[in-house]
């Protein structure tokens, strides 16, 4: 499946728009506690532990997005947008959300 931030796919023609779809993944407060406990992971101002968790959450959100696209009969998703939001008590949770338009291309 093709998943892209662009509104179209070069060399492909959109033949059907299936609808707007989304995928989400939420990281709980425990990851933030673990990050502070594992401060030794920070190298050059970056936390490998935190980055791995964000990558995992992003992958989950994108996989969910693709599953929704397949359920609608789409073979591509165009115009995707990734967002990161903190919420909950003391912003203790992080949500990764992705949305886009499911399409059929030829």
Curated annotation (Swiss-Prot):
Lineage, opening ranks:
Bacteria, Pseudomonadati, Pseudomonadota, Gammaproteobacteria, Vibrionales
Cross-referenced Pfam families: YbjQ_1
Task: Check the record and name the SUPFAM superfamilies matching this protein.
Answer: YbjQ-like (SSF117782)
What family is reported?
Belongs to the UPF0145 family.
**InterPro entries registered for this protein in UniProt:** UPF0145_dom_sf, UPF0145_YbjQ-like
Q: Which NCBIfam families match?
A: PRK02877.1
Task: Please report the name of this protein according to its UniProt entry.
Answer: UPF0145 protein VC0395_0288/VC395_A0976
Domain of life of the organism encoding this protein: Bacteria
